[in-house]
């Protein structure tokens, strides 16, 4: 077993856990390289007749060969044995009952509903039944199809044990994982990533990985996109700097294990179903690699938020961390948006999020703290879904407290909170088990029922004959 050191040109960040040091490479979209053993990367070519130290050269392609160079993604892996050395795949038994990869109307386990939905945090079983990341993963909603290479799925997970003797591979799309409770130590073919709550990790389509739980039970959120990949959003008039900086995205350095592992299992998600194949070695046998298609993580506290500085509430798109675009300019298959600590300074302005009906669909989660638009009921580890054109906005308590504040024009710092949103142009279908879940808040609608009319003809407002003008 070997622990990598970064190449001399790499920028590194180090984290310690149990005496181990994790070294990372900096930069989203960069062409990176890493060697766990010096001299194992071929020089000047990708697939020599005989690779250094007798390794096998294997390319992992994230885009078609003919994709434009600016969007072409691939990585060369130099490994002890190639991935193809395994027994045939078979459907996993027992099958996973709560994963979906196709959301058309014929999928009997999903329904369409415009109702506002909210879920309380799911309990994580402390020991029994044992659930690793794969078994603890379940789909909440989604749209499109992994077979048609267009769409997304939103999952949640609750796990109480590390993956042992197996690795997971998602052939359907990219995973963006948001841990809310408990660190994740993720071993990938490119190396290891330690991801605590407050950070995110992206595992691109096709990578094999295993999830360990160094702090014990963990839960969180997962978005999955079909047929495209996440990228930084355009900044437009913001300029060259701001929001998420490419240099703050960190990828692993090469790490490998050379051990005999009879019965090691590869669990492959394909079309939303799970298949298994066995082999006699660990898939984490990559001694060196180079390319621009790699797993990466990001610390959300490094996000540089923008906001209005005089009046009105900015649209939430100003808080986009990553986007998965469609072929229509400005229309996202899926945006990952956060609501981090920040200053609120707008004058004569209702500062919480405004009441809204949106052509996009919004799935929200809360990592910690209290969300500014919900005084109670929306808890860390919980979730909400407001689908296309479904009304939503601040609850009654938030509205009444905001408009009656005597210091409403004073600057205030929103702190101790971190919420996020997965937003998509595609209308989701919701899994029946999510609708039937005991965690579902069936009284969610009540948080708005108390909103009352403040309109009066006697308070200097407009009359029906004279429209309100300023």
UniProtKB/Swiss-Prot annotation:
Catalysis performed (reactions): homogentisate + O2 = 4-maleylacetoacetate + H(+)
Source taxonomy: Eukaryota, Viridiplantae, Streptophyta, Embryophyta, Tracheophyta
Pfam families: HgmA_C, HgmA_N
Recorded metabolic or biological pathway in which this protein acts: Amino-acid degradation; L-phenylalanine degradation; acetoacetate and fumarate from L-phenylalanine: step 4/6
Keywords carried by this UniProt record: Dioxygenase, Iron, Metal-binding, Oxidoreductase, Phenylalanine catabolism, Tyrosine catabolism
Entry cofactors: Fe cation
E.C. number: 1.13.11.5
Source organism of this protein record: Oryza sativa subsp. japonica (Rice)
Coiled coil residues, start to end: none
UniProt name for this protein: Homogentisate 1,2-dioxygenase
